[in-house]
Amino acid sequence: MNEKSFTVKNPSHEQNKRVFIDGSERNVAELPSMYIGKGVYRPGWRWSKHAGLQTGKESTRHIGYIVSGSTVIQDASGQETTVGLGDAFEIGPNHDGWVVGDEPCVALDFETR
């Protein structure tokens, strides 16, 4: 038996895409052990306004990495921090986030299966 020992996918080319009401989008690559999402969020995009409202869901825990741009994340207690280029982050459920500045925020997020 000769099973391949690797899986290669590019989230930018995957069919699992969500386009938000402002035109921002998130694609997901499904790997055997995890999901990797790539989001391109336009200036002014906000989770509660453009994702939560559209999906009817609460925000969940996110582990991610900012490829470009920046976003403010606000935790459930109201504390805020800005994450930007090169920052890795983890935030718990029931948070909000919004893009700051004139540049789209490109972020990767990781979720185990």
Where are these regions (language model features)?
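A short, N-terminal "cap"/entry segment at the start of jelly-roll beta-barrel domains
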Residues: M1-V40, S48
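Surface-exposed loop/turn positions
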Residues: P32, W45, D87, P93-H95, ...
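Conserved short histidine dyad/triad with adjacent acidic residue
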Residues: K38-E58, E80
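Conserved GNAT-family N-acetyltransferase fold
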Residues: G39-Y41, G64, F89
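Short beta-strand segments in beta-sandwich/barrel cores
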Residues: R46, G69-Q74, G97
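Short, conserved beta-strand element in jelly-roll/cupin
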Residues: T55-I73
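Short acidic-glycine-tyrosine-enriched beta hairpin
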Residues: D75-N94
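Ligand-binding loop in jelly-roll beta-barrel domains
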Residues: G92-R113
